[in-house]
Structure formats: C-alpha cells, structure tokens
C-alpha cells in the first residue's frame, strides 16, 4: 500500500498476485481510495481487496518447501504475530469462485488472520462456505459474508463499488467499477464478451455502454489471459448448438461428455443441448462435480426446471435409464485418475454405465487429448467413437476474452487507459499493442505484482512506485490426533524456483514431442475409424 504521507487524492491500484513473472495464478488486487473531507479538510483513506487467490503451483516456489503460497497482505490485513497495518482493508470483493481468486482466504484464516467482510455472488459465497466447512475452519472465525448482485452499488468508506455481470466458466461472475469522485477504475475480473448463458445471463454490454456514455472510466484493468487469440471466445450459445447437433446425429447411442468439474456454465449448456435433442442426462463426475452441482442448486439454479422434458439423474439413477437415451456428463477430459469415467475405462467396477459403442466427446484437441486417447485405446473398447475439438472446434470455448472480446468491451466502457491483469509480461505486451491499435493509452511498463498505479483527476494515470512482491509460504502439519498446525514465513518473489526456466524448456520440448506423437496416433486412429471424420460424416 501507499505510504500515508504525501498521498495524492485519487485511486491507487496495486496488483499483488496474478500479474506474475511467468504465470497467472493467485489473483489479488488492492484498491485504495484517497480523498479530502470537505468539511474537516482531513485526508480519508479506504482500502479494499479484490480477490484473494492462492498460487496453483506451489512446487515452483522456494524449491517446493511450502504446501501453499499466497500473496503477502500483512500491510492491509492483521496477520497473527505480525505488526498491525496502519490502514487495514475494509472489505474483500470476489469476482468469482475459482481457487486462484478465492482460496487465499482459507490460508489467511488458518494463519490466524481476521478477514474483513467478503462481498460476492450467492454462488461464489456458497462455494466459499463449502470450502470453509471442508477445511473444518470454525464458523466463529469466518468472515462476514455479504451477497451482492448485478446492479448493486456498495459504499465502503469513501469508495463506491458498482457491480456488473461478467462471463466466465461459472455462474455469479462479476466485474467491478471502483470510484471515489476523484477517479474511476473498471476491473474486469475473468471475463469474455459472451452475452449468452444457460444459467441466467452473460455479460451485459448495454450496461458497459452506459458507463461509456456517462464519461467512461480513467482506467480499465483487463483479463489478458487469451487476448493473443484472434476473434471472439466461443460463446455458450455456439457450444450449445454444437453439442445439440452431435446429440441429434447420435440419437440412438449413449454419449459421454467429459467436462471440467468446476465449469458449471458448460455443464448447463450441455444439459440444455441434451434437452433440445431429447436426451436424458446422467451427471456422474465424482465428488468435485457433485459439490459444484449442489452449489448450483443452493444458489437457486434449477436445471430440472429449465429442462422439464428430460430426466436429469445422478450416478445412482443411471442404471434406471436406457443408456442409449442418455448423455452422461462426467470428468476425465485430461484423464484425471479420480474421474469415474477414467476409472471405468481402466477396468474398475465402479458402477459407471458405459456402452461399448458409446460416443465420447473430448472437447480439447491435439496433444491435450493424448492422455485420454491413450486410456481409451488401452481399454480395449474398440467400438467407442471419439469426437474431439479437431472435428468439432466449437465443443470447446475459453472462459477468457480473446482479441475481439477486448475490443468490444473496451469500446463500450471507453477507458482512457488500459492495463493488463491475469497475465505474464508477454501476454501483457499483446494487450498493450491491441489497446494502442484501437486508440487506448497504456502504461509505459508491465504492472507486475507490487507495482502501484495512481489514478487522479489532476495528474491522470501514472505509475506511483514499483516494489518487489512478497509471498507467504505456508505449511500445514497434521498431528496424530488430526489437529492441523499452520506455520508461515514471508518469502521474496525471487523465491520461485531458479530451475523454472530449465523446467519450462524441458516441458516445452516434451509438449512438442507429445504433439508429434498425438498426430501419429490420431492419424492411425482415424484410419481405423476410431475417431470421427471432421467433414462429411454424421459425427458417429
């Protein structure tokens, strides 16, 4: 955070995680509002945190010494055993429920930290509560949780936070506009310009245009994960149509649809496509998918009410339905070992219903299918047919904005300057070039973690300071009675493995080799009819 002395009126933004040197994990951003009380002349300061994620690859940190790694926030949170911050954060706002945006909260609570009130959608807060219960964190230590919805305007001290819908891979995603009368920032969160959703609504471009018509914003911090890709991210409506077509072309066959356990937007699209094709649905993706489906229900999303013409059952109900009338939504697209589908393919008698001539839809393509293809071939079920992202590209869609998504949103919000988030430097450079091409100003350098940007009506947008980011490395040790002891230490950003570049080079060469192997295998599999042809066939 910015030092109290000599503070200029305005809004301060500091990424603490997500704008990493080499990856996108641990999203966490500080926003500090500095204004003058017109009655007393005193300086008033309010800080909020947007997202508190953890790093998804702790083994790359300090040679794998720690179980968990989170951005160091002891300058705005009262961490047990450390000095209390001068200006503690007043609130936490969550853009969505993914672990790289939320589960730092779990770690800080286990470190003995008091977390200020947490604001999020009903779905996001339900997922947060489920995680707290699973970790057996006592309820008296939980932060206060405040459910907000699209269109809400929340006043925190001298800062106003307005809530806008975002489109990602889960329901209840938000973008936020933060303003204080001196300056304004639009924070996209993870998003794309998809206005379609089978769980309510996608983004609301009309609300973005209202921002633009009312003067725009001074700065837009924008999801840059996939801006290097041309065009728009595939919409849920396009994905729905592709699945519906496949289901109708294979009306008399069982269909297996592996998905990510957490991608509930995609699950809803697939279920609705099945209903449109008159196919019943079995949801059998293991414990993780079951938890997410339950979270949908408790947040008020009712797939049964949305698709009353079909039966939607869980794993236990599968045996009561004719497999040929069903789409089984499961996990295992990356051959995850705990997937019920993958365990069945490997010969385990786990009750997973699988016809020997089923159609398997693997939404990714190339080397990303290599593991699943290997499991399928070893299963000995030669009657299975595989449809991948090669044959049907629109069975997959990223939850992140591509180039045209950025242009559409930026032209609606009309920021005076754009800054990249959720990316590493190379991807940030792509966003900056794209922004400049479309007439938007950019910062002179990559705002990596620890960079503080000040937005002021007097001086515009500029980099205030650049500091080396710090992290907490955390260990959880369980004693013989099952009690968990948590310890932590602050580590500099340089604590990331010095072998990272070497590891990345090895991984890159392995990926290139896997692509070649995948190409050979796919060619051989297609030759013997294991994989459907892309053109001219009926998808069987």
Positions of PLM-derived features:
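Short beta->alpha junction loops
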Residues: 391-400
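Well-formed, non-transmembrane alpha-helical positions, independent of function
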Residues: 107, 408-409
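Non-Sec secretion/translocation targeting segments of pathogen effectors
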Residues: 506, 511-540
